[in-house]
Regions:
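Short linear sequence motif anchored by a di-proline
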Residues: 1-234
Length: 234
């Protein structure tokens, strides 16, 4: 799963990386949690790629209770084409979710107890971004307001991530962006082939402070490397 991530750096660099025609202003964030407003990238019909701020936590268009969104932060790539909550969005409403890095928690046995050690995962290119495969949905509230929401598609961990957690976000390569974003592309079979673990060489990992477990902790210190007693990479 992916329950926290970060997005920071000059907006000009993000616009260049994703070839955006327009993008709303956003602020650097180092501990983005579900139910936050997050930046996604879409490719509307007849236009170029655009950035849009939406809520993280998918509310399917048919949902009676918007509270379902709190449970739909992630969509397993293996079943995204068939699960009722996701299959419509997968076929017709896909997006990219840009990230400077993400967090995963490793279960560590210590003194007869199990604690969770967070790790920060960032692109091997220090100026790069990850592009998470994402889904979108628009839900109309009883008062007529339309709420647009998103979720992150996940996949099995690659070799680098496996010692930390069994799941990770599905990260797309630049040459896959257009097919994933194309609103006219309904070939779910071909789309499913894009969902898989990216190569370990594309990322770096480092342990960070458990302080990020709190959703109100924010700032560059969130991604600073800390010392740990034992590491699965030693």
């Amino acid at each position: 799963m992916c329950g926290r991530y970060a997005l920071y750096g000059p907006q000009s660099r993000l616009r260049e990386a994703f070839l955006l025609e327009s993008c709303p202003e956003y602020f650097a964030r180092y501990n983005i949690a579900p139910q936050s407003r997050v930046l996604v990238i879409r490719h509307p019909p007849g236009a170029g790629r655009v950035g849009q701020l939406v809520r993280w936590g998918l509310i399917p268009s048919w949902a009676k209770d918007p509270g379902i969104g709190a449970r739909l932060n992630n969509a397993r790539g293996e079943t995204v084409a068939v699960k009722p909550a996701f299959r419509g969005s997968f076929a017709r409403h896909r997006c990219l979710i840009p990230a400077s890095g993400f967090y995963e928690w490793q279960a560590v046995a210590a003194g007869g107890k199990v604690r969770k050690q967070p790790w920060y995962v960032r692109p091997a290119d220090p100026d790069g971004f990850f592009a998470f495969a994402g889904l979108l949905a628009a839900w109309k509230a009883p008062d007529g307001e339309t709420i647009v929401t998103t979720c992150i598609v996940t996949t099995a961990a690659n070799a680098l991530m496996a010692p930390i957690h069994e799941r990770m976000p599905a990260i797309l390569r630049p040459e896959q962006y257009e097919a994933w974003l194309d609103p006219a592309n309904h070939d779910t079979g071909a789309l499913e082939t894009m969902i898989g673990p990216c190569g370990s060489e594309a990322m770096c990992v480092s342990p960070v402070s458990p302080a990020i477990n709190r959703g109100d902790v924010e700032g560059p210190h969130c991604i600073e490397t800390v010392a740990v007693r034992s590491s699965p990479f030693e």
